């Protein structure tokens, strides 16, 4: 008989997250802000790198940016930051397995989302006013990414959101279940690289790029960059991310491991 490491990891994660949230919402908020900030740091560096390399080889920034961005999510998982998109998998699986209530899952996800956004806004403001972003224009890499995303229909944003969080939680499950530290890192980087390269929609990643552009000198030149459209985009992305990470990754893995003692993860 073999016990499921997946279930034990989910139970531990749910208890840890619920305990911190219940005992100190301030500490939980800080961990959530770190996640939003870490992604903003890697977004900021990747976007400037993309602009520079595009001057040497036009179009090559599309390949560089995802690689640099991916480190931000690696920082989050290795440094115990609270990222809403991975929590969608952990908490949905935990609720199905009765390790945490559905109500508490919804409450933590919304709280985590809010402080992922606040972390991204603070870091985004800082980068937007830094020397690297002093001359940002409509033609800059990050401006193009934000404008492209805001021009998408709800149906496309939903699909891209689903795909993004399947990739993200492939990374998270690899981090949780694989033993070797080096293998964990490369599996995380590979999955994150892929969703960013494909321009899929990830709510916290969008907090990062949108925040940098919103506070920058280029903000007024971005088409459809208004609060109602931004909130529309984020809302649909959140739903897509929940479907991908919670319903298509967390729930199936919880079902596959429940009441099993042979073929388990």
Tell me what each language-model feature is:
Residues 1-265:
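Alpha-helical transmembrane segments and their helix-helix packing motifs
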């Amino acid at each position: 008989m073999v016990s499921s490491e997946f279930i034990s990891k989910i139970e531990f994660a749910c208890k840890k997250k619920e305990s911190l949230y219940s005992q100190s919402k301030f500490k939980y908020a800080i961990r959530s802000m770190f996640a939003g900030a870490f992604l903003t740091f890697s977004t900021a560096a990747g976007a400037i790198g993309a602009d520079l390399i595009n001057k040497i080889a036009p179009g090559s920034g599309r390949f560089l940016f995802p690689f640099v961005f991916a480190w931000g999510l690696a920082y989050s998982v290795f440094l115990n930051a609270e990222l809403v998109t991975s929590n969608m998998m952990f908490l949905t699986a935990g609720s199905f397995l009765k390790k945490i209530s559905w109500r508490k899952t919804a409450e933590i996800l919304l709280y985590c989302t809010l402080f992922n956004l606040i972390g991204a806004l603070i870091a985004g403001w800082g980068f937007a006013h830094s020397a690297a972003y002093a001359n940002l224009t409509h033609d800059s890499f990050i401006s193009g990414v934000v404008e492209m995303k805001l021009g998408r229909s709800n149906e496309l944003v939903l699909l891209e959101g689903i795909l993004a969080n399947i990739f993200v939680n492939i990374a998270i499950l690899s981090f949780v279940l694989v033993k070797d530290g080096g293998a964990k890192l490369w599996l995380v980087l590979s999955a994150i690289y892929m969703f960013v390269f494909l321009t899929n929609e990830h709510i916290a990643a969008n907090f990062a790029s949108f925040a940098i552009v919103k506070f920058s000198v280029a903000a007024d030149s971005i088409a459809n960059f208004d609060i109602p459209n931004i909130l529309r985009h984020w809302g649909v992305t959140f739903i897509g991310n929940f479907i991908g990470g919670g319903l298509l990754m967390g729930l199936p893995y919880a079902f596959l491991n429940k009441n099993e003692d042979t073929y388990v993860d």
